[in-house]
Amino acid sequence: MALLGPSGSGKSALSIELAQELDAEIFSLDSLSIYKEINIASAKPSLKERKNIKHYALDYLNIDEKNNASLFKTLLEDAMRISQKKILLIVGGSSFYLKSILEGLSDTPKLSNEEVVKIEREISALANPYAFLKSIDPNMAFKIHPNDTYRIHKALEIFYATHTPPSEYFKANPKKPFAHAISLFALSVDKNALHNHIKQRTKN
């Protein structure tokens, strides 16, 4: 069961109420709350709320570590395996990650921190990352908009890690759909009320 909504929509408070009513535990699918050092913008539950209701994927990464859909998938599978409750409530604003998890992810190369740094340095040195991607893998470049820097970067990470054109790598490593069915619920909030809520949060 997943509850999604933008920052300031009230999903965190609602998730606490639902978890209490349903006797559930909470998995935080949030690209900010997963970091130990980020607290204000992420609207993490209080220590008291966490004491009463078990939360997963909070304060997991240091600020210099990267999060991605593959990491959240691994953490979600771990949480489902060890949770003591019948219901695990997935809560967050990262609908992109949830969509990626549900549709399926390909296995990605396991890299050391040193290898990650080296690859990042090589990609940063490119004058035109999209043009380079087009030169090594026209098929993959055709599927990605030139302004989609995230997907371009991910494709180049695959290339530098495997020395294989990304389209060939994904053909050999097809997506694996998520093994569990998840019911989705989304919160809809008036835009002005949402902006006011976010302003108030950042003042505190």
Feature locations, PLM:
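Phosphate/pyrophosphate-binding catalytic cores of soluble transferases and nucleic-acid-acting enzymes
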Residues: 1-204
